[in-house]
Amino acid sequence: MSKIAKGTILTLVAGIAWGLSGTSGQYLMTHGFPVLVLTNIRLLIAGFLLVLYMVLTNRRKLVEMLKDQKAMMSLTLFALLGLLLNQFAYLKSIYESNAGTATVLQYVCPVGILAYTCLKDCVAPTVTEVLSMMLAVGGTFLIATHGQLNQLSVTPAGLFWGLFAAFTYALYILIPIQLIKTWGSISVIGVGMMLAGIVLTPFSGILRFHWQLSMKVYLALAGIILVGTILAYTLFLKGTSLVGPVKSSLLAAVEPISA
């Protein structure tokens, strides 16, 4: 299988997994889970499981990455500006509006990534890239709203958090590209999530949160942590390293279909 084909498949699967994550997150928030607590839970548990996997399977590579100061500086930026802010902003956007509106706003992101890539490389976008961008954003809009504008009832807070989610989503895609090529997606995602989760813990209220658990809550937590976080983030960033940030951000627009 070619590199492009493999990256395309990984990114599409990640987008589908993210759709489940958004649905699970919306269910948990309507059943008493605050946004910060939910963000903290998924970062800590997913990060711990990924780091544990690396300890058991490739401890030497994990230790080498942790000792590399340049890598850890980039990883810290990725953890705070990409993982932490993006997960919080997306869930906050859902909370302030709805899953469809939040998804449409977040997928303004590919436009920004294309603009950044063209400016960085000093090249103009191709006709194919522009058409793909229009089709992806337009398709996301139609899927999320069924073509009915009245389903996009955006409050000022919902608009802010949705656009902020798009910005942080771009950072999440762009910052770790070189890290993943060097150290692998599992190491980068695992340590990044652990760092972000630890930083958030004193401020999220998770230590004071009163858990009300049921089988449905367990299933929703499994959906958002195992499928929507560990699987989705790892596959997406690996796919991005293979097909590039512009194509991966367009392919991930399959998310609303699964949601």
What are these regions (language model features)?
Residues I45-L49, L105-L119, M134-L135, L195-V199, ...:
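Alpha-helical transmembrane segments of compact multi-pass small-molecule transporters, enriched
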Residues L38, S185-I189, S248:
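Juxtamembrane helix-start motifs in multi-pass secondary transporters
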Residues T30, Y95-N98:
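Helix-coil boundary and interhelical linker segments in multi-pass alpha-helical membrane proteins
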Residues M1-I41, Q151-Q178, I198:
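Glycine-/small-residue-enriched transmembrane alpha-helix faces in small-molecule transporters
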Residues V37, T101-L105, L159-F160, Y218:
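Non-cytosolic membrane-interface motifs at loop->transmembrane helix junctions
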Residues V13, I41, F78, L105-Q106, ...:
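Hydrophobic core positions of alpha-helical segments in small-molecule transporters
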Residues M1-V13, G47-F78, E96, L119-L131, ...:
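Membrane-interface interhelical linkers
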Residues V13-L20, S24, Y53, M73-E96, ...:
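Hydrophobic alpha-helical transmembrane segments of multi-pass membrane transport proteins
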